[in-house]
């Protein structure tokens, strides 16, 4: 027996048995290929192409609208009355409306001082503003720190209230709802909301309140987010590109056309009477902000987006935190659509076109189709056509439409144009979780109401770096393994290899790149990695 002849140690009966199984499996696949696999894949291609066209038309429509808005200079002060609030000698400070500032927080050790300090630094008559810190922290040390910070500002004459609850029912929505029940809130006209990592500039109220004061049908003024850590890592740059498009295009288009868009949950100021008329805060989904916005819109209230007003905040820089955030942002809207679709269709307070905009454009295309088609088409169906060459995808669906959509997205962040290829691959990876979360929301699955507060690092990374010489850093490798990403990566790698040897479409160039992106995410090598000491 030769040393390299491994087949000689395997019984002939086993080899024959293995060949029989392989032949039988091949025969079964051949038998079901034509009547089952090919038609099913063709149907999948047709559905995905339809969704791609829906998304393409929506993006082109928004591109046209935003171009017209810029061309004709439809600035906010041309659509809504704006006059600076003037001093009144007779009325004194009572001429200024009473404003409530709400800051909900949960174990925000790294950023609580930033948000509280920024809120206390807002320029407004001191007797016409109330700052309400809603602390749901479960860590007693952090609660003490937050309370001490509030006391420190109170000693300086700031009207600040520190509020806690004995439970976390309703999470953020529950905290905001409880805050609105306080007796001192009854005298307030407007409420501005800032999450714990948001830092408004001192003139925030001077630039927003006049719109609400002079336009009685205006319920909400939303500011834009400005990211202080967008250059921290490649993942934060990718987030910046997506969110810049959201604010620059989606929010602006909604504000300019139907005076409706989704409230971003922070960096906005509401008319309290409108908030109450809409039914107040509800915790039935994880997107209480969007829920409130839709209900207020159905009451006939209008919204205004101020793109020129920016509020600094922090992007999630760890992959774990970003995944949790994207689950909430994808699952919540799908679940809200399930709960409110009929209510929207039967509403009599808004026009038919606004109903179409809310149901079709806002929910179906942007919150459902955009997530599903990205993953199902580009990461499942398109690769599958490599293995089943009887099914083809037209070039306009595989190349032209996604290329145009990508270029339209680039208008939000011109400085990151050179990163578009990385952005595409990253968005496809994240579409896996968004698609899963979307179906959980639509079907009200087990994690439909999962609420995990997005982790903010603040300067924790810098602090960790200074301790490297004193302590040995250990990374728990197993905590960073993500099986779903690795599974999709293996599928794409296999299809890519098959296409490289037997295919004719040269999809393997894309498939290999996308597989690598899934592997990078699957092994947790993305975003900021916080060491465990």
From Swiss-Prot:
Q: Quote the catalytic residue positions.
A: 136, 289
What topology in the membrane does the UniProt record assign? Multi-pass membrane protein
Documented EC number(s): 2.4.1.32
Top-level taxon in the UniProt lineage = Eukaryota
Q: Which residues cross the membrane?
A: 37-57, 368-388, 404-426, 483-503, 510-530
Its main subcellular localisation, reduced to a broad class, is Golgi
Q: Which family does it belong to?
A: Belongs to the glycosyltransferase 2 family. Plant cellulose synthase-like A subfamily.
Name the record gives this protein: Glucomannan 4-beta-mannosyltransferase 9
- Per the UniProt record, the source organism is Arabidopsis thaliana (Mouse-ear cress)
